[in-house]
Amino acid sequence: MNLNELQPAAGSRKLRNRVGRGTSSGNGKTSGRGQKGQKARGKVRLGFEGGQMPLYRRIPKRGFTNISRKEFAVVNLEKLNTFADGTEVTPALLIENGIVKNQKSGIKVLAVGQLEKKLTVKAHKFSGAAKAAIEQAGGTTEVL
């Protein structure tokens, strides 16, 4: 056996069927699509259901986007433990330390985790539980 005599295994190299290339191929003229009609022609658009009212039009429209919605940057209590006792925590300090990326419409402090430090926290909003936890730890809150 020589290198030029090597053959691929039988059935391992099947040629793809090229349609529309002459009648003797068995898939010429209509290219295996039959006669006329929608299926013999181009594609139907995405979401087309054969003339039936499509799903995206059967389902009612709902809700709206509130243009005056304010989105707050969230700070959890557990993140405030990184500061030393007696620190005055301001939005600028939070951004500087990488706790929040940007201020958005303001900063809101939420009561996720425990606070073990006595801090003066200045933010735009506080949840009730967060405010209580800061004051219980001996700190103070100030709404900006």
UniProtKB/Swiss-Prot annotation:
Family matches, as Gene3D superfamilies = 3.100.10.10
SUPFAM superfamilies given for it?
Ribosomal proteins L15p and L18e
Query: InterPro entries, from UniProt?
Result: Ribosomal_uL15 (IPR030878), Ribosomal_uL15/eL18 (IPR021131), Ribosomal_uL15/eL18_sf (IPR036227), Ribosomal_uL15_bac-type (IPR005749), Ribosomal_uL15_CS (IPR001196)
Superkingdom of the organism of origin: Bacteria
Segment Disordered: which positions?
1-44
* Keywords for this protein: Ribonucleoprotein, Ribosomal protein, RNA-binding, rRNA-binding
User: Per the record, where are the segments of Gly residues compositional bias?
Assistant: 23-35
This entry carries the following GO cellular component terms, namely:
cytosolic large ribosomal subunit
Q: Report the function annotation for this chain.
A: Binds to the 23S rRNA.
Q: What does the record note on quaternary structure?
A: Part of the 50S ribosomal subunit.
Q: What is this protein called?
A: Large ribosomal subunit protein uL15
